[in-house]
Structures are given as C-alpha cells and as structure tokens.
C-alpha cells in the first residue's frame, strides 16, 4: 500500500512538473492521475465515476464488447468518445487548442490488461502511441488511458485478458457487469475545488461594473461597485469571452463570461459472460445429436415411402 501511495505521489508530481515547464500546456486536461491521487476507488456507491466530479458537462459515450468470452482469452473492449473535431477548447494558457480525450474501464475482478506479448498485432497498430495502465496496484482490473489527441483517438481500445476459474477459485462462470467512462476536453473543476479557466465565473456581488481592464497576460480585471459604495475586484482567466460590459448592472453570481466548455464526460455500463468451455462442448454435442436425429428421421421417412410405393405397385 505504501508503494502504491508513493507511485501515485510520484506520478502526480511529474504531471505538475511537466505543466510547470510548459510542455503541451495547450492540451492540458484533468489528468487521470488527479482521480488516482484523490480516490482509492473511482466508482462511488451511487455508481458515479470520479471523473464526473471535474468534468461537469454530460456527453454520451458508447461501449462495444463481446457478449461472452472464454477463460484466458484475449478480447477487446472499445469505448467510443465522439465529438465535433472542428471545435477547439480553451487551453491552460488561454489560447485555443484541440481537444484531448481520456477513458476509464472498470472490469470485473480477475479481468485485467492483456500482456503485451499476447496482444494481437492489429490491436497494437491501432493503439500505437497509446499508454494504457492499471488504476493502481490494488485495482489492476481498472484501466485508464489519456490524455491523448482526440482527433485520432475517438475510439479507445482496451485489450483485456479473461481470468480462468480453474486457476482462481474466487472467479466463477457468471455474467459480470462492467463500467466505462470517457471524456473529451479539459475539466471545469480541479480536485482542490478551484475552477479551471474552462468554466463560467459569476459576479461576487450585486452592483454596477465601473471598470474592465485587460492585463498583458490577457486576464480581465472587473471592478463592481454595490449600492453601499463597496467596490470589489474580480480577475477572470485569459481567453474568456466576457458577457458583460462597463456600466452594466449585475446581480450576485450573474455570469460574467460565456461558457467556454465544449467537452464533457459520459459513463455507461454493460455485461459480459465468462463462458464455461464444457457448456459449449455440451451445446455442440446436443446440436450434433439433434442434427443426426433429423437426418435419421428423413432417411426413415424415405425408406417408409419406398416401402409404401412397392406395396401399391404389387
């Protein structure tokens, strides 16, 4: 457990360091590491995934997976995260940037990421440059991916290995539920509760806007004077389009900018059957016996018809 916490802390620190030095800052998003850092289990008791706490807009996703799988088999679970690729989001530096996508797949216990040497070449080609990892050392059945370029990865493919009940007594041949989530674009809230610049900012008091100035960094400073003569100042992040103007009277919490968010998060659930091979063999044997019976009945009928025809001729 201590190793797991150290790994999460290290990953979190690296993420902050990368952002601090400005690498890929235009594509900054709410990294999965934020969820990993703050939630030991990403699925709450009510079924809500942790990603939805930062990605406030709801957008649909789709899941594609086989209905049934055999023990030790490798199969694909595909999460589709569709969006309009002509749209751009507001980057952390206030400039327009393409959207990134990310996904989370919560598999039944025992199911896990397929070993690299067993992943089909076709899947490796599709996932070229994509890094899929377990949520933590404790939950290797929960897989996360992202952030990655959305224009080329609207279909997230997870190669999964099914468990073998013969080797693990805790696994049974049953129908299991699994859960998936996918987001496009940056989050509106950081894990600390602070708003990101992909959000709507409300007026901190009622009153008249006496002055609006823009700094060299592109930030907007808004002065609001209330009826009691108290003046407050608000600073809005760079890149936001204001929905108010100087001299306008506003109410408390009235939006000061147009909603810049073009992304959103969605989650779905489905089921998968861990099929017993013996049942399949039994089913095939049953089908074969039915086929043989049908053939025998047809042959018997033909034989009977020949006997009847011979008696009539006699």
From Swiss-Prot:
Biological process, per Gene Ontology: photosynthesis
Entry membrane topology: Single-pass membrane protein
GO cellular component: chloroplast thylakoid membrane
Key words of the record: Chloroplast, Electron transport, Heme, Iron, Membrane, Metal-binding, Photosynthesis, Plastid, Signal, Thylakoid, Transmembrane, Transmembrane helix, Transport
Signal peptide: 1-30
Cofactor(s) this protein cannot do without: heme
Main location as per UniProt: plastid
Annotated cofactor note: Binds 1 heme group covalently.
Annotated GO MF terms: electron transfer activity; heme binding; iron ion binding
Annotated localization: Plastid, Chloroplast thylakoid membrane
Transmembrane segments: 280-300
Residues annotated to bind heme: 31, 51, 54-55
Protein family membership: Belongs to the cytochrome f family.
Subunit and interaction comment: The 4 large subunits of the cytochrome b6-f complex are cytochrome b6, subunit IV (17 kDa polypeptide, petD), cytochrome f and the Rieske protein, while the 4 small subunits are PetG, PetL, PetM and PetN. The complex functions as a dimer.
Function: Component of the cytochrome b6-f complex, which mediates electron transfer between photosystem II (PSII) and photosystem I (PSI), cyclic electron flow around PSI, and state transitions.
Name of the protein this chain belongs to: Cytochrome f
Classification of source organism: Eukaryota, Sar, Stramenopiles, Ochrophyta, Bacillariophyta
């Amino acid at each position: 457990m201590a190793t797991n916490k150290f790994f999460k802390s290290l990953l979190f620190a690296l993420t902050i360091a990368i952002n601090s030095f400005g690498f890929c800052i235009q594509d900054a998003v709410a990294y999965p590491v934020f969820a990993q850092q703050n939630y030991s289990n990403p699925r709450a008791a009510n079924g809500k995934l942790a990603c939805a706490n930062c990605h406030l807009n709801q957008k649909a996703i789709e899941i594609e997976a086989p209905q049934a799988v055999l023990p030790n088999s490798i199969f694909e679970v595909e999460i589709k995260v569709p969006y309009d690729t002509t749209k751009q989001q507001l980057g952390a530096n206030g400039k327009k940037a393409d959207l990134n996508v990310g996904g989370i797949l919560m598999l039944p216990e025992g199911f896990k990421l397929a070993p690299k040497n067993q992943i089909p070449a076709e899947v490796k080609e599709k996932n070229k440059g994509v890094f899929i990892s377990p949520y933590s050392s404790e939950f290797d059945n929960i897989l996360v991916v992202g952030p990655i370029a959305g224009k080329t990865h609207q279909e997230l493919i997870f190669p999964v290995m099914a468990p073998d009940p013969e080797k693990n007594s805790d696994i049974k041949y049953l129908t299991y539920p699994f859960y998936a989530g996918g987001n496009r674009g940056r989050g509106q809230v950081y894990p600390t509760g602070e708003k990101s610049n992909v959000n709507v900012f409300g007026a901190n008091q009622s009153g008249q806007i006496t002055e609006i100035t823009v700094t060299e960094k592109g930030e907007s400073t808004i002065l609001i004077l209330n009826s009691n003569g108290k003046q407050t100042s608000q600073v809005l992040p760079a890149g936001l389009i204001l929905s108010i103007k100087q001299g306008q009277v506003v109410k408390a919490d009235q939006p000061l900018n147009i909603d810049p968010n073009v992304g959103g998060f969605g989650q779905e659930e489905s089921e998968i059957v861990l099929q017993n091979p013996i049942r399949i063999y039994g089913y095939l044997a049953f089908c074969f016996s039915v086929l043989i019976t049908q053939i025998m009945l047809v042959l018997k009928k033909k034989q009977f018809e020949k006997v009847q025809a011979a008696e009539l001729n006699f």
